[in-house]
UniProtKB/Swiss-Prot annotation:
Its main location: membrane. One of its GO terms (molecular function) is proton-transporting ATP synthase activity, rotational mechanism. The keyword Membrane applies. It comes from Pseudomonas fluorescens (strain SBW25). Pfam families: ATP-synt_A (PF00119). NCBIfam families: ATP_synt_6_or_A (TIGR01131), PRK05815.1-1 (NF004477). This is ATP synthase subunit a. It is a multi-pass membrane protein. It comes from the Bacteria. Coiled coil: none annotated. Keywords: ATP synthesis, Cell inner membrane, Cell membrane, CF(0), Hydrogen ion transport, Ion transport, Membrane, Transmembrane, Transmembrane helix, Transport.
Length: 289
């Protein structure tokens, strides 16, 4: 790596491959966090976009392959795995979703597998993919992050998609009047029309904050846990470059131990994101508040 200090190494691994408009008016890649910041809102994290799309395609190809090879006879290992996964997700939907919609189970399955695959990239040694990017581009300073869920843009994008579905189903099931009433007539109510009118701003403030908190908490929970996990891997990798034999040996042990524990984290975070999506959409399908 071009960065010789521990801080430079860490900063390089925590920076996205950002493409946007440079100060000179041209378009190109940012080679530092300062350059990426100057690009503003319309900068693109190409590593996040690329890995998200690639892993989504891998998910589709695996399940398509399993569907083509599905048989009523002796199932293969892939078919068994997919069937167990589908039954697990379907059971989770039946337990937590109290409405009727053919979309929820496929959506939950997509979220769980897709988020899990994006999280699982964190198990790849931290230097492998950045070094591969350097070999391909020939640019020793180019940053490249492979774990899409450590980018708040990715987690917030998924959370906003779920939020859009919450709004859509709330209006579809309850009607626009019911949706507005849910935001303005609860949690405080009164039979006195004048008092109820006074309570509308208070109710709206409370319910609006609760509504907005759903996508924000959904995004930040996944981002925070995965970002912290990646940072631990990077800090452990710094031990290998310390030049001290005993510290490098400790790094090997810690790397293995954290990787084993991290398997639980990446699975749990995918499950939590899926379950919260199911619960939020179930609440959107409820007729009464």
């Amino acid at each position: 790596m071009a960065e010789t200090t521990a801080s430079g190494y860490i900063q390089h691994h925590l920076q996205n491959l950002t493409f946007g408009q440079l100060p000179n008016g041209g378009w190109g890649f940012a080679h530092s966090a300062a350059e990426a910041k100057e690009m503003g809102f319309w900068a693109f994290h190409l590593d996040t976009l690329g890995w998200s799309v690639a892993l989504g395609l891998i998910f589709v190809l695996i399940f398509r392959m399993a569907a083509k090879k599905a048989t009523s006879g002796q199932p293969g290992a892939l078919q068994n795995f997919v069937e167990v996964l589908v039954e697990f997700v379907d059971g989770s939907v039946k337990d937590s979703f109290h409405g009727r919609s053919p979309v929820i189970a496929p959506l939950a399955l997509t979220i769980f597998v897709w988020v899990f695959l994006m999280n699982a990239v964190d198990l790849i040694p931290v230097d492998w993919i950045p070094q591969l990017a350097i070999l391909i581009t020939g640019d020793a300073h180019i940053p490249f992050r492979a774990v899409s869920t450590t980018d708040p843009n990715a987690t917030l994008g998924m959370a906003l998609s779920v939020f859009a579905l919450i709004i859509f189903y709330s209006i579809k099931v309850k009607g626009i009047g019911g949706f507005i009433g849910e935001l303005t007539l609860h949690p405080f109510g009164s039979k006195n029309i004048f008092v109820q009118a006074l309570l509308i701003p208070v109710n709206f403030l409370l319910e609006f904050v609760t509504l907005i908190a759903k996508p924000i908490s959904l995004a930040l929970r996944l981002f925070g846990n995965m970002y912290a996990g990646e940072l631990v891997f990077i800090l452990i990798a710094v031990m290998f470059g310390s030049g001290l034999l005993w510290l490098s040996g400790l790094g090997v042990v810690l790397q293995w131990a954290w990787a084993v524990f991290h398997i639980l984290i990446i699975t749990l975070q995918a499950f939590i994101f899926m379950m919260l999506t199911i619960v939020y959409l179930s609440m959107a399908h409820e007729e009464n508040h």
